[in-house]
From Swiss-Prot:
Species: Marinomonas sp. (strain MWYL1)
Positions of transmembrane segments: none
Name this protein carries in UniProt: Large ribosomal subunit protein bL19
GO MF annotation list: structural constituent of ribosome
Function: This protein is located at the 30S-50S ribosomal subunit interface and may play a role in the structure and function of the aminoacyl-tRNA binding site.
A Pfam family per the record: Ribosomal_L19
Highest rank taxon of the organism: Bacteria
Length: 120
């Protein structure tokens, strides 16, 4: 491994200090996002189902989908972005696929995800 690669890994490790809970596709999460309106800054909660997750160190990202006024809204977040204040897992979902894009075509009861029950 070259010095350049080691240096990049060291810098990325320094920036990845945020505590991120373990979550995956199918989980319902609440993301607290910093929103700047004019001169003030406030926190906005974005609650939805994780439909994809990309683990790439500092470049990790995840996509959250929610239904707002009957319309599906998806938003992609960078996991270690300074705009993401916190991530809270509300409910664990039991899915078999890593990317659950099939939820885009579904609505109503067919878009529901079974809850993952804790093992005894």
């Amino acid at each position: 491994m070259s010095n350049k690669t080691k240096l990049i890994q060291q810098i990325e490790a320094e920036q990845m200090t945020k505590e991120v809970p373990a979550f995956g596709p199918g989980d319902t999460i609440v993301v607290q996002v910093k929103v700047k309106e004019g001169s003030r800054e406030r926190l906005q909660a974005y609650e939805g189902i994780v439909i994809s997750k990309r683990n790439r160190g500092l470049n990790s990202a995840f996509t959250v989908r929610k239904i707002s006024s009957g319309i599906g809204v998806e938003r992609a977040f960078q996991t270690y972005s300074p705009l993401v204040e916190s991530i809270e897992v509300k409910r664990r979902g039991d899915v078999r696929q890593a990317k659950i894009y099939y939820l885009r075509e579904r609505s109503g009861k067919s878009a529901r995800i079974k809850e993952k029950l804790a093992k005894r």
